[in-house]
Design a protein with these regions (language model features):
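Extracellular ligand-binding/catalytic regions of CAZymes and related secreted enzymes
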Residues: 74-77, 84-89, 95-123
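An acidic, glycine-rich "communication" segment
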Residues: 1-74
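Mature catalytic domains of secreted/periplasmic carbohydrate-active enzymes
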Residues: 3, 80-81
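Short beta-strand segments
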Residues: 68-69, 92-94
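Short acidic-hydrophobic surface loop/beta-edge motif
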Residues: 68, 81-84
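A broad, low-specificity signal marking well-ordered, structured residues that form hydrophobic/aromatic
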Residues: 64, 90-91
Length: 123
């Protein structure tokens, strides 16, 4: 948390909310890939992603892409967002990579491949 107040705020592909934007549930939230041909997620089976237990609510910034989204009470929120910046890219993963929110996600068969592609996208 706190990215909206950090030095990186203007570089992010999302706009962080000014209030406590942590959303949690023991039932979990459904995940859906919006851009399956995006280099970061190409070839991953998003239909098998188990529900995530929480995320940081935000909005996609102008010029950013929502690659993967998460649903809460009928509303969709960015889960994986990305934007080009200079010669590179900035990516935000709006949930945890640790067992707290991601315990189910860590059991996803494509978990390792996801992280590998996140840092080394297929071109």
């Amino acid at each position: 948390g706190g990215w909206g107040r950090s030095r990186f705020h203007d570089a992010l592909p999302v706009e962080c909310l000014q209030h406590d934007a942590l959303v949690e549930s023991t039932a979990g939230y459904a995940v859906r890939c919006r851009l399956p041909e995006h280099p970061t997620v190409r070839g991953l089976d998003w239909s098998t992603v188990p529900p995530l237990l929480g995320f940081n609510e935000c909005r996609v910034r102008e010029g950013g892409d929502c690659v993967v989204e998460i649903e809460n009470q009928g509303r969709r929120h960015p889960l994986l967002a990305e934007r080009r910046l200079g010669a590179g890219r900035v990516t935000c993963w709006m949930t945890g990579a640790s067992p707290h929110w991601g315990i189910n996600f860590m059991k996803w068969p494509d978990y390792r491949r996801f992280w590998s592609q996140l840092f080394n996208p297929q071109t």
